[in-house]
């Protein structure tokens, strides 16, 4: 499953929210030396208990993640509608 997200680094917390059909991910880390991307992958893997990788947007706030699970399972785990 591919998931389009917008990340907000240096937010002081890790949180995934869905608002107006968009998924937003708030990160503690700064977007320096790949720290925000590393936190994103680590925390999403821990939350979803699935393989997660960034397929697009390594240097952008807008990213596409590839997650090894069904859309329904992803919606249930994140409590969002896609």
Language model feature labels by segment:
Residues 46-50:
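Beta-rich strand-turn-strand
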Residues 1-42, 53-59, 63-82:
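Contiguous, often N-terminal, cationic amphipathic patches that form binding interfaces
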């Amino acid at each position: 499953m591919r998931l389009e997200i917008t990340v907000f680094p240096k937010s002081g917390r890790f949180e995934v929210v869905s608002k107006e059909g968009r998924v937003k991910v708030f990160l503690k880390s700064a977007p320096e030396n790949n720290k925000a991307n590393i936190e994103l992958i680590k925390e999403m893997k821990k939350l979803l208990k699935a393989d997660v990788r960034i397929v697009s947007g390594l240097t952008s706030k807008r990213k596409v993640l590839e997650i090894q699970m069904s859309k329904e399972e992803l919606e249930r785990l994140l409590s969002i509608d896609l």
